[in-house]
């Protein structure tokens, strides 16, 4: 099952790189432009020296952008993987399906926050760090696979066949940890490569203008984010496809 998750996710992404950049390209170009504008506007000032009101407004703008872009990319990629639906060259769609996707994402985020609030409550109630640490580890052992199984509501929402949290959990038995390890295995090489490239570029800082160095670092981060993002989404796409195969005839797909 893990092997299939890995194989399906890799083939979906690296067998369709043109579609990857159609789905993500416009949003990441906007993100890159926004990052450059922020750097130019703030002049590299840190958050402590910046105007608090401006920082709050900036944070809200970034949050709204992140929600819109992640939903648009997630919906488009799930629909491509499960329905074979290919977006246009410029993909910036945020419609009804994307808004539902955002609401489901916020629901999952709320569940995640509640888990950490429970850990905080135990720390306050008991006040023994070792006990809290053990409790947190035990809770995570249960929470990680459960959270990923519940996350199958996202691809279901994207293809407009919504399911409840209970249904997502019921159809995904055995997939939780496998989706976690698949995501880890697929993303780790790119994360490490990003760290290595940043280290190498910083080592060249003396021979490059600072603005050029920042430009290269941001461009590198954007490219790596695209690959890591679609790989993570693809694991959920593949997991949903596998979970649904036993319950209905699979939709036409590009997992070939």
Give the location of each predicted region:
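Juxtamembrane transition segments at transmembrane-helix termini in multipass membrane proteins
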Residues: 47-56, 65, 69-88, 149-161, ...
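Specific transmembrane helices
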Residues: 61-80, 105-121
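Interfacial aromatic "cap" segments that immediately flank transmembrane helices
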Residues: 1-33, 91-114, 145-193, 237, ...
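Residue-level signature of transmembrane alpha-helical entry/exit and packing/kink sites
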Residues: 19-23, 55-59, 63, 100-101, ...
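Alpha-helical transmembrane segments and their membrane-interface junctions
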Residues: 109-127, 187-204
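Hydrophobic alpha-helical membrane segments, chiefly transmembrane helices and signal peptide h-regions
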Residues: 63, 67, 114, 137-140, ...
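Membrane-anchoring/interfacial helices and their immediately flanking loops
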Residues: 26-61
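Membrane-proximal helix-loop-helix units in multi-pass membrane proteins
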Residues: 114-141, 148-152, 159
């Amino acid at each position: 099952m893990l092997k299939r998750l890995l194989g399906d996710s890799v083939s979906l992404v690296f067998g369709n790189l043109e579609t990857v950049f159609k789905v993500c390209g416009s949003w990441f170009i906007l993100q890159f432009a926004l990052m450059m504008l922020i750097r130019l506007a703030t002049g590299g000032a840190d958050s402590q020296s910046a105007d608090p009101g401006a920082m709050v407004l900036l944070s809200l703008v970034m949050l709204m952008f992140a929600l819109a872009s992640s939903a648009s990319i997630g919906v488009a990629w799930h629909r491509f993987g499960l329905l074979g639906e290919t977006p246009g060259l410029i993909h910036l769609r945020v419609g009804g399906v994307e808004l539902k996707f955002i609401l489901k994402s916020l629901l999952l985020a709320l569940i995640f926050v509640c888990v950490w609030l429970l850990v905080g409550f135990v720390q306050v109630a008991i006040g023994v760090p070792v006990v809290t640490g053990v409790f947190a580890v035990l809770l995570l052992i249960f929470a990680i696979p459960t959270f990923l199984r519940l996350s199958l509501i996202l691809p279901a929402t994207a293809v407009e066949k919504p399911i409840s949290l209970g249904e997502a959990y019921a159809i995904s038995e055995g997939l939780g940890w496998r989706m976690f390890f698949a995501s880890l295995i697929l993303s780790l090489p790119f994360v490490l490569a990003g760290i290595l490239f940043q280290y190498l570029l910083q080592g060249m800082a003396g021979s490059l203008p600072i603005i050029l160095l920042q430009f290269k670092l941001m461009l590198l981060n954007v490219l790596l984010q695209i690959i890591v993002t679609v790989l993570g989404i693809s694991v959920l796409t593949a997991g949903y496809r596998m979970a649904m195969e036993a319950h209905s005839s699979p939709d036409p797909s590009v997992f070939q």
